Amino acid sequence: MDLNTDIMKRIFITILSAAALLTACEEFQPVFTGKYENPEEQYIYTDEDFGGKFTSIADLKKMYVNAPVKVKGRCVIKGQVTTSDQVGNLYKSLYIQDETAGIEIKIGKNGLYNEYKLGQWIYVDCTDLTVGDYNGMINLGYEDPTKEYETSYLEHAYIIDNHVFKGEYDEPVQPVEVSEADLLKDVNMGRLVTIKNLKYGYVDSYGLNQIFILAYIDPNGDRKDYTNNCIFVDDSWSQPADRSLWVDTWACSEAKWKEYLYSGIFDNVEVAGGTVADFKNPDGTYNIGSMAYSVSQYFTMGKSGVQVRSSGYARFADTKIPAEVLDGTATVSFTGILTKYKGESQFTLIDLDGVKKADGTNWY
């Protein structure tokens, strides 16, 4: 395939990007998890189509130095797909990795698992795409015209089809086991890994046993207004005596959030100069917009904390964490994508098959 610049193609892409690109979304959103009709047979790309010359994913990530960078000149990466959005815990993105590193590709559509199979080789022409960062995680996307984020999604099919090329099918990537000492090493960020024998809960440097629920007084308001709009929950507020009311699920669907909210367990959480209870209407309902909420459940690996973040739109959002894990009588091992958020270890499950007992058998 000739990768020389096609002037008309680039002009068309520029026009489309100005008209169609949306900014990156900070939160998880609904994900189509059904099945599309089988597409027509497509061309399968091979190394020969690209002259057999590739930039490693590690070298691509090194292009980022404290600011987003638009890739210029010939730059093609090649990697295997390591994620699936079938259960809804990833949003408009997939991860690929080669022998050097892994990276998130921000493809702006749902149902990616129907098009990009686990283990399939993917080629990405990075020319004119942008390498950016989100709270410590380097990703590849399009330039965000609003400058609110460092990258946005490849929203239009024409743009996707001229940058992302499907290669041959292969066996799924095998996860690498990562130790506590390697949790925050750059080489492991964005890769499919397994971490073993974690205990539920994590006491931070302030002595708080962490659980993190991200919710908003106004879901349509400023989601970066942490003082007046965001609801953060840890055990600095009193845990209810009735343990059944505590947040013991991987995330919260909209229905589950309402169940928790109307139980009253969040009433004393401080927000916007008051408490959640202050946002009740005269009839006793809460004046808080309804949406699904992501939850980070904290676990301890050795002496390190790992937050396992799950989407309220995931099929397993309302699935309870095993009782033996919650009460500390059993440990848990995870397989999924290792990331970080503001310097702390964060983990994304692909599905509940990635949640194992100490002996390697499934919890679910």
Residue map of PLM features:
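Positively charged n-region of N-terminal signal peptides that target proteins for export
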Residues: 2-11
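N-terminal leader/targeting segments
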Residues: 1-3, 18-19
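Sec-dependent signal peptide hydrophobic core
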Residues: 12-17
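C-terminal motif of bacterial Sec signal peptides marking the signal peptidase cleavage site
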Residues: 21-24
